[in-house]
Amino acid sequence: MGLTSTSTGAGAADTALVLRRERPDDRIVALAGNPNVGKSTVFNALTGLRQHTGNWPGKTVTSAQGRCERGGRGYVLVDLPGTYSLMAHSAEEEVARDFLCFGGADGAVVVCDATCLERNLNLVLQTLELQPRTVVCVNLLDEAERKGVRVELEGLSRRLGVPVVGAAAGRGEGLEALMAAVEGVISAPEPPTPVPVRYPPPVEFAVASLRPLLEPRLRGRLPARWTALRLLEGDGAFLDRLSAALEWDPRADAALWGAVEEARADLERQGLGGGAWCERVVSALVETAEAIGAASVTQLRSAAGRREHNARKAAQRVQGPWIYRNGRGGAFCGYPDLERSLRV
């Protein structure tokens, strides 16, 4: 969802990033993805030499935006920093999250690596919670084919609840279909309905208690479910950004903030105080990403391919938890029925 270009204006003042439109009706599209998934290749293939680079204001993080046209419509693509998460534990994650929230994007594309899809889906799920007008681009299909990996694109789309387009951007394949899907989700009267991540019952109860209060206050500018989680986190810097962007400080809203404090107290009573409930949220994201990936990828054909795939999986299980423990600490919790429910 996020604040759109209509609600923020051409300058996207909330991020202080000047968006370089050539026409007032140019679409603003955020391009997100993990590092090394070919995101820059997609960006370069679509925009060619029509690019502008610099730094995000106040950050030592490189910014890039470029323009392309398809079917008479102009698009400004904003290449977000490569990140594994939107939980804002680094400058890159903060930039990506804040642009998706406040940067005026009409929609988003999340680029994934077809050869290690499961690892990429964590960011996809987080992006969908924030911006449902999203298209998932499964890139590097040519490399996946060489390694004997097949991604079931239609099944992946069903499990995520948003359009999924396959691409081999290095060969220019799939880009027309990608932009057609982008236009489709942006121009649709209603956004897609992504399949929500199921959090532990105490967290879902806390979120549900806040949504009726948030929806009339947000008025569609940000998703109430996603915002409820952020209020429960209580990140002061993000709340300052939220207050400036919406001209409304939730901390000064007695009824709402009282409900936030009560929801936190209830989580504490159930043994999920402090950062414990955040760890469970991260666990649910990781488990859901793994289950969707496992249900959407056909295993490799050759013994050599299987060895490489298993090595990638082992590395992922080492690196993935390290990334999240680095920010939150704690162990992951499993949901044994999740994979079965996602094999639809």
Role assignments for model-derived ranges:
Residues 30, 42-43, 61, 77-79, ...:
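Residue-level signature of catalytic and energy-coupling elements of molecular machines
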Residues 49, 58, 82-83, 114-118, ...:
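Conserved nucleotide-binding/hydrolysis micro-motifs of P-loop NTPases
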Residues 161, 191-344:
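Extended helical scaffolds that flank P-loop GTPase cores
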Residues 2-90, 102-103, 107:
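Conserved G1/Walker A P-loop phosphate-binding module
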